Amino acid sequence: MITVDALKSFGANVDEGLGRCMGNEALYLKLVATIPGEKNFGKLSESIQNNDLDGAFEAAHALKGVLGNLSLTNMYDKVADITELLRTRTEIDYSEKVAEIMNARDELAKLCE
């Protein structure tokens, strides 16, 4: 089960995230626990594999918002980086950046078990 201390170790700005949830720790942890199942991770990966930069941008931008709202800073930074590259339709190999994001998602999923 996920804890505030585990999230802090993970790189989340828990105090900021709790502030957005009006100090309701149970609500904050419940919302964070939904992140690994967020469908936009799959959409981002699939869009990149299909070289669909518009679809990848939409997925990354949505993830950026959710991760930012929950102050999952380490994940947010990775997603914000790829979002800006996709916004400008930068033609690069995104596979390493997507892998970093998916690894962070998987690490968070383990914390949520």
Locations of the language-model features?
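Two-component system phosphorelay core
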Residues: 1-58, 62-113
